[in-house]
């Protein structure tokens, strides 16, 4: 896998790096217009989700919490965007895997009647096994397949033809291929953000073409009024993080295989709670894809998991069940937590510059 130089790749890993160093690095390795456009699209999608799903329904103390996380999330987005890397052309294998992931998930859920969260675990586990060392898939190909799998949970039927699902899978693979190594590097759960953006685009295209409002992902996420989602979201993030960093398990496999096991146990022991608690776990696992330059320790990964769970406690509105909502919310939690970590330990741009300079300039996260 070829390296993609970052905006600070020429800097030494020095904690004394300055704002001037960052400006110089940005001028030398500035993100391409495509990178900035994709970043803006992600910001619009995440902003719409946050305002419609959280801000408009918060009051009192909840509103203060949502405002704080929103401000931190915006700061985290800015810090991530200015350290984004030049974009590259999409790879055919990434686009193909996005399509295959969507088709496979669609066959499992709609043709074979497999429960949604089980389909997520099965599809992701297969993709993850293929991305093991010496396997045929690298990280970006497996991530594209995972993103396509989430978009494949769009429901076809009388008002949404199979063709829209195929378009969603192709778009997810295409976007992930370009976003992965370039846009918001190191930010966790971008797979979910890409799935949410892709699902939104397909939803709008279907409406503009005269199709009635298409059904959405049938995972109930409104009114997650069980505080159990806080520890479950944190546990999902931490278990996945440990598997990645202690056993060198590929991210997609580390996310999907435990999700399959956990949701299977829940289906036996607590069948009525699977949609809520299982969704909390799956969304939490996506946080573990954050790079160490953003969330460097297990403490910050766990904190992002708690923030994610706290956000989902207050989610509601017309976007309930929209493809990628859980992952997009996890992305917001990652950016907010990364900004908090930077404020606590950085206080200026120097340490962030040094961290990005030390981070491998490869699409590993």
Predicted regions and their residues:
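Compositionally biased regions
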Residues: 3-4, 85, 365
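C-terminal transmembrane helix-loop-helix hairpin of multi-pass membrane proteins
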Residues: 12-77, 89-99, 106, 115-119, ...
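Glycine-rich, hydrophobic membrane-spanning regions of integral membrane proteins that mediate transport
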Residues: 81-86, 103
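Extracellular loop-to-transmembrane helix junctions
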Residues: 121-125
């Amino acid at each position: 896998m070829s390296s993609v130089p970052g905006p600070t790749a020429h800097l030494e890993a020095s904690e004394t790096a300055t704002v001037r160093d960052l400006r110089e690095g940005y001028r030398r390795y500035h993100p391409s217009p495509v990178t900035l456009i994709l970043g803006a699209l992600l910001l619009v999608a995440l902003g719409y989700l946050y305002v419609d799903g959280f801000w408009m329904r918060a009051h009192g103390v909840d509103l203060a919490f949502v405002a704080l996380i929103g401000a931190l999330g915006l700061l985290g987005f800015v810090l991530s965007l200015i350290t984004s890397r030049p974009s590259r052309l999409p790879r055919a294998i990434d686009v193909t895997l996005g399509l295959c992931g969507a088709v496979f998930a669609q066959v499992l859920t709609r043709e074979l009647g497999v429960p949604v969260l089980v389909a997520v675990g099965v599809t992701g586990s297969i993709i993850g096994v293929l991305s093991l060392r010496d396997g045929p898939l690298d990280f970006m190909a497996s991530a594209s397949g995972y993103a396509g799998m989430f978009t494949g949970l769009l429901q076809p039927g009388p008002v949404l033809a199979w063709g829209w699902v195929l378009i969603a899978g192709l778009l997810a693979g295409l976007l992930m291929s370009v976003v992965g190594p370039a846009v918001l590097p190191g930010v966790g759960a971008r797979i979910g953000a890409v799935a949410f953006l892709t699902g939104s685009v397909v939803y709008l295209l279907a409406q503009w073409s005269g199709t009635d409002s298409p059904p959405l992902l049938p995972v109930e996420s409104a009114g997650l009024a069980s505080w159990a989602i806080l520890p479950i979201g944190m546990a999902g993030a931490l278990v996945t993080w440990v598997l990645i960093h202690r056993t060198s398990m590929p991210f997609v496999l580390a996310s999907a295989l435990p999700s399959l096991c956990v949701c299977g146990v829940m289906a036996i022991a607590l069948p009525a709670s699977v949609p809520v608690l299982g969704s909390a776990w799956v969304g939490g696992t996506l946080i573990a894809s954050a790079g160490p330059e953003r969330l460097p320790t297990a403490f910050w990964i766990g904190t992002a998991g708690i923030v994610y769970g706290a956000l989902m406690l207050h989610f509601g509105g017309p976007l309930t069940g929209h493809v990628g909502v859980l992952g997009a919310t996890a992305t917001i939690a990652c950016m907010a937590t990364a900004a908090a970590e930077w404020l606590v330990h950085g206080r200026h741009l120097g340490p962030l510059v040094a961290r990005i300079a030390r981070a491998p300039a490869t699409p590993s996260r």
